Amino acid sequence: MKEGLKILMSVLVSSDLSRAIRCIKTCLLQTEHNLDFQTYVVINTQDKEFERKMAEYCNWSGIDYEITESDGTASTGKNSVFEVFHKKKEFTHLIQIDGDDFLYPTFLRHIERHLTKYPNTDVIGILPCDSIYMNYEEGFHKLNNGIYAGLWGTNYSSWYDWIPFEVDSIFSDKCTGNLARLMLFSRSIPNKFFYDKEQVIGEDYKIHFDLLFAHQRDEITYWLSSASDTWVRDTTSFGVQKQESNCVVDGEYIIRRNDEFQERLKSYIEKTNGVYRSGSGELPIDFAPLYMGVERKISFLNNIL
């Protein structure tokens, strides 16, 4: 085991039992690493039947879990994971993954590599992130079950569009949103940073700015990683933000841009740190090796989906 590191891999679940179980299984399928880790399920839901079935599955599988109080917002669920991690002092780092997403088997291999090379890291965001979709777009790969995968390799040319210096894209007509998935937190983060439950759409985006500004003040160290063979985002699920958006395009629910939440976040940025230096181009980027190429990714996705 990697000396001095102990990882709490927390799966946050609120609905959709089959996706939640899929996520848990991918946490347990990690390969080629030497990290001491525990998979831990946080059940944060208002659906009592789902709560019962999820607890039943965890008991049957021998997986530790905790039921936390839910108000129906994604922020409250994610903050409850922070609270669990804060209580579990034996763990050095937290991985917080939404139960409708899932991991490649090389995820922990990347975490180990990064923390070995950059041990003072407090936050890692993965960008770009592989995703699965209901509808086809140019460049997507069709999977056996009829859905499509948008997969990244080692082409970094698009980073110039996604990682703006100076001013974030939220202040332009072509807001790209926060495309990064926050995949690792050190013990420095919980109890100091929180997801805002008033930011019903874009809570990840808002905490990104809090972390970015803290990085600029030299209070924490926030990295972006190019390791696309880590996390898979499932855009076919029907989560809280899609329910709030209630927007269907080509038969698929999407998270619609919400002007109220967008303007609230812009105002927050202006008051907190100012428009300038709001771009994430100041964050260091770890151009990580790719352990899983496209063909291996497709094979894994066809087996897990």
Residue ranges of predicted features:
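Acidic donor-binding loop at a coil-to-helix junction in glycosyltransferase catalytic cores
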Residues: 200-207
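Short beta-strand-to-loop acidic/aromatic patch adjacent to the donor-nucleotide binding site
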Residues: 91-102
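Short beta-strand-to-loop element that shapes/binds the nucleotide-sugar donor at the catalytic cleft/hinge
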Residues: 124-141
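Glycine-rich, basic loop-to-helix element that forms the pyrophosphate-binding segment
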Residues: 69-86
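Short, well-formed alpha-helical segments that are part of the catalytic scaffolds
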Residues: 16-30
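Active-site donor/metal-binding and catalytic loop motifs
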Residues: 221-255
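Acidic donor-binding/catalytic loop of UDP-sugar-dependent glycosyltransferases
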Residues: 101-114
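A recurrent flexible, glycine/aromatic-enriched loop bordering the glycosyltransferase active site
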Residues: 157-185
